[in-house]
Amino acid sequence: MDENRNEVGGGQLIAGYLGIILMLIGGIILLPIMLLAVYPEESVYASCFTIPGVTAILTGYVMSLFIRGRDKRRLIGHQDALIVVFSWLLAILFCSVPFMLTGKYNFTQSVFECTSGWSTTGLSVVNVEDCPKIFLLFRSVMLFFGGVGLVLVMISVLSDRHGMRLYCAEGHTDRLVPNLVKSARMIIVIYTGYIISGTLLYIYFGMNWFDALNHSIAALSTGGFSTKAESIGYYGSFGIEAVTIVLMLLGSTNFLAHLYLIRGGGKNFFRYCEVKFQLILCALAAPVLSAFLIYGGLEGHVGQGFRDGLFQVVTALTTTGFQTVPSFAVWSSPLIMVMTLLMLIGGGTGSTAGGIKQIRVCIMLKSLCWIIRSKISQKRLIHADGIYRISGYEYLKAEERLEASDFILLYLGVFAAGTFILCACGFGIGDSMFEFASALGTVGLSVGITGYDASPVVLWTETVGMLAGRLEIYVIFVAAVQFGREIKDGYKKTEGR
């Protein structure tokens, strides 16, 4: 009997894990207060962070008591998905409180801004030119932790036997080393190292330290939040744009690929199908976009046209959302179409980027080629085809092809639904497709639909799209079903008493 009492499972186990994550969220909310040492004049905003931060820590501590010092039962069903989704919802809700406490933003706008931050999207309702620095840093802090993932950060601190299930449920696919905790810590070390390097390079090319830090985090997390209304275009610097392109490409590349590259496995890195596919897409799309910009009269100088064309292709494909052009509202339909396609494809698996993911598109295109080849072949051949992963050449199973095609179909279905809602709000089909592709792909580029004055319907549609895109849709559906089961089981237990 004593052993059973010391075991915890079901709702208490879920609540306990959420408590640990909520304490982590509280700590994250308090981080921007450190900036007051440099900008003491913004201490008036300190309470905006201390109130929700301390509340989250205390609430999380109470919830964590459910599992403290007790043996944890195995997670059953899809409780892992439920924990991940609720973790992200708690992060968004608690982080929205500082914005609401300023009195400038309502609940919808605050939740939208924080969903954009945690999902590393970059769409915004904030006027960055009139925003206190402590809130600009807070947005970047959300990008940092949203990029690596809440669960991954928790695992790096705690060693837990359920960690792998939670790690996978959040969308991470690869372990850098056999030990999961070491994998999580290694990802954070690589991630932080790139950010520090990017910050120093930005300072070298003329940014002040505050802008450099924020833009480095935003570029590597493929988040796109900027401290300037004109984004990267404000600086008009080739060096800054080059650093940004490198950081965006690094952020959209699988972290396992980074490890191989750092350890000297350059051969495998450049053979990796996602790296090759990304470089090929950039090489094909950049000249097309540049040509339309130049001949469409949107760029007065050929060199600037190619510069902007390459930058916008990379920012769309990596789902970052920085821009060097004044506005997308004046772009022609072919330009909008190219950008929309790139945003739908997105970045690599196991990276900070969103979208369908390049590996799935690679598998779909390869499958299509194999089908065509088998159709035109005069002999009936059985092909055992595969693709280059970072570890080497691997044959593809039928289940992998089916999973890729199923996800693409589901993704496009959600994309169509979101586009329809924006169209119903009175926007054109092209603009609606662009805007929702940006939200669902966690990109952050906008044709002007999203902003402080956007309607609640638009903001909530994009909020759902951003969260679904960051958690790869399936997890949301699975968590919803599991939540229903938990309520049903709890009701049955209550009836049994």
Residue positions per predicted region:
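Membrane-proximal intracellular helices of multi-pass ion channels
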Residues: 1-497
